[in-house]
A protein has these predicted regions:
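Bacterial N-terminal signal peptides that target proteins for export
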Residues: 1-10
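Bacterial N-terminal signal peptides
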Residues: 9-19
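Sec/Tat signal peptide C-region and signal peptidase I cleavage site
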Residues: 20-25
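Immediate post-signal-peptide N-terminus of mature secreted/exported proteins
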Residues: 26-57, 61
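Compact alpha-helical subdomains of small soluble proteins
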Residues: 61-138
Length: 138
């Protein structure tokens, strides 16, 4: 089954992360900076691949990155139920989308200029960043 776009796939997989606090006073997963940063990287790569026709997402690599995030959450003591509830949070989805746009804007990307988005994506690949590693030239 081929996914139409990685962003939709990311949002589906995003449900693996929990928003519900645990009785033993663990932080919400959304407050875990490392997990949130990794999700943001995947989301930025996804948005670049959606907007730039010369770049595509490395979907399998993105899936493995999401599975790694889930593994980290489990190591932190979050249950499958807690992790699975995170995707269903529309608030978290909106926050990720907004922070993706903010990240791109903060890096000089005009979200209405496809050429600039593509240049940023190519730059990320050239610099071998995490975002760049989730992308490839078509």
């Amino acid at each position: 089954m081929e996914f139409v776009n990685l962003r939709f796939f990311v949002l589906i997989c995003f449900s693996w992360l929990s928003f519900i606090p645990i009785a033993n006073a663990k932080y919400l997963l959304i407050e875990n900076e490392n997990i949130w940063h990794e999700l943001l990287q995947i989301s930025v790569a996804s948005k670049i691949s959606e907007k730039c026709t010369s770049i595509e997402a490395r979907k399998i690599k993105g899936l493995f990155a999401l599975l790694q995030i889930k593994s980290v959450a489990k190591e932190l003591g979050y249950t499958d139920n807690e992790i699975n509830e995170f995707v269903s949070s529309e608030e978290n989805k909106k926050k990720l989308k907004n922070e993706t746009d903010i990240y791109l804007l903060d890096n000089g990307v005009d979200l209405n200029n496809v050429k600039i988005i593509c240049l940023f994506g190519h730059s990320e690949m050239d610099q071998e960043t995490t975002i760049g590693s989730l992308l490839r030239i078509k």
